[in-house]
């Protein structure tokens, strides 16, 4: 491992951190250390990292802004690549937007709304990165990434880089082909937006933000929605009908504001959260015969 670290540093791939606590990089403020954390400063840094990872036969994982993650208390084995400031370029040409995967989604939707471009209003309260949003087809307010994405540039596991169209990404509810058949890293995204009235777009975004503030617990560290909605039900409604609102294990608590959120009230461990997730699954199955599936990604040792 030490030799790999030295080669990564010599290759100037970006910041290279050893045994770095991942709680610093997730919105839940939970997570053990990464053996090696890379914050690449350019695409070439990612390519070189993957070359070395293959050479050393080391496991690797990619994270974005950590908004939809629950990282194990034992951390993540191997190399963790965090997409961020090195991949945050932005080009706007009329209605076409080309943006790096590390660009914050809220910042992007806010900026474009002020330019009178419509289509990303739903993302005004999603605290993730563009890359993560494409990877999981993030959405809210009856819309999602698939409704506005034209194509995405992907770095595949074998080192190949290619564009995948909206159709090729095979989007579905909170899912894409990148999670299953064609694993890879989102490097860039191209969105096709529409011209709109600036005042109306900004008002719509503000309404979305206000709704989220009133109904969701953003005053505590959390990872967003824990479960996918088991259509035709809403996950939060089922949790609340089961009488689990406010239930606590250790430092983790099912939010008093919204049943589909688990918050870190202070000092919560990943195991606390996992115990709550299992409690919810079993309770909902027993009471309503509904299977619950997590939307939050659970990773680590």
From Swiss-Prot:
Single annotated GO MF: FAD binding
Gene3D superfamilies: 3.30.465.10, UDP-N-acetylenolpyruvoylglucosamine reductase, C-terminal domain, Uridine Diphospho-n-acetylenolpyruvylglucosamine Reductase, domain 2
Keywords: Cell cycle, Cell division, Cell shape, Cell wall biogenesis/degradation, Cytoplasm, FAD, Flavoprotein, NADP, Oxidoreductase, Peptidoglycan synthesis
FAD-binding PCMH-type domain: residues covered: 29-196
Cofactor(s) annotated in UniProt: FAD
Keyword Cell inner membrane appears in the UniProt entry: no
GO cellular component: cytosol
Pfam family, one: MurB_C
EC class name: oxidoreductase
SUPFAM superfamilies: FAD-binding/transporter-associated domain-like, Uridine diphospho-N-Acetylenolpyruvylglucosamine reductase, MurB, C-terminal domain
InterPro entries noted in UniProt: FAD-bd_PCMH, FAD-bd_PCMH-like_sf, FAD-bd_PCMH_sub1, FAD-bd_PCMH_sub2, MurB, MurB_C, MurB_C_sf, Oxid_FAD_bind_N
Superkingdom, taxonomy of origin: Bacteria
Catalysed reaction, written as an equation: UDP-N-acetyl-alpha-D-muramate + NADP(+) = UDP-N-acetyl-3-O-(1-carboxyvinyl)-alpha-D-glucosamine + NADPH + H(+)
GO biological process, one term: regulation of cell shape
Active site: 174, 225, 295
Pathway of action: Cell wall biogenesis; peptidoglycan biosynthesis
Family: Belongs to the MurB family.
Protein name: UDP-N-acetylenolpyruvoylglucosamine reductase 1
Organism whose genome encodes this protein: Bacillus cereus (strain ATCC 14579 / DSM 31 / CCUG 7414 / JCM 2152 / NBRC 15305 / NCIMB 9373 / NCTC 2599 / NRRL B-3711)
Source organism phylogeny: Bacteria, Bacillati, Bacillota, Bacilli, Bacillales
């Amino acid at each position: 491992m030490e030799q790999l670290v030295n080669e990564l540093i010599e290759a100037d791939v970006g910041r290279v951190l050893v045994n770095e606590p991942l709680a610093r990089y997730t919105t839940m403020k939970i997570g053990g250390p990464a053996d090696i954390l890379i914050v690449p400063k350019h695409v070439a840094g990612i390519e070189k990292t993957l070359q070395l990872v293959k050479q050393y036969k080391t496991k690797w994982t990619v994270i974005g802004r950590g908004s939809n993650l629950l990282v194990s208390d034992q951390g993540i084995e191997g190399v963790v690549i965090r997409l961020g400031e090195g991949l945050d370029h932005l080009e706007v040409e009329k209605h076409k937007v080309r943006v790096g995967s590390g660009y914050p989604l809220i910042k992007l939707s806010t900026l474009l709304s002020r330019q009178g471009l419509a289509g990303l209003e739903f993302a005004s309260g999603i605290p993730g990165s563009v890359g993560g949003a494409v990877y999981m087809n993030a959405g809210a307010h009856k819309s999602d990434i698939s409704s506005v994405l034209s194509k995405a540039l992907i770095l595949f596991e074998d080192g190949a880089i290619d564009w995948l169209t909206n159709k090729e990404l095979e989007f579905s509810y909170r899912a894409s082909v990148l999670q299953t058949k064609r694993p890879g890293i989102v490097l860039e995204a191209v969105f096709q937006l529409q011209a709109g009235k600036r005042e109306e777009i900004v008002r719509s975004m503000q309404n979305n933000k206000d709704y989220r503030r009133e109904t969701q617990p953003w005053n505590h560290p959390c990872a967003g929605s824990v479960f996918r909605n088991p259509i035709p039900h809403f996950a939060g409604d089922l949790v609340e009908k089961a009488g689990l609102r406010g239930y606590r294990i250790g430092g983790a608590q099912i939010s008093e504001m919204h049943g589909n959120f688990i918050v870190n009230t202070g000092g919560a461990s990943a195991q606390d959260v996992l115990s709550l997730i299992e409690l919810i699954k079993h309770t909902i199955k027993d009471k309503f015969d509904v299977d619950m599936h997590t939307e939050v990604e659970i990773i680590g040792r």
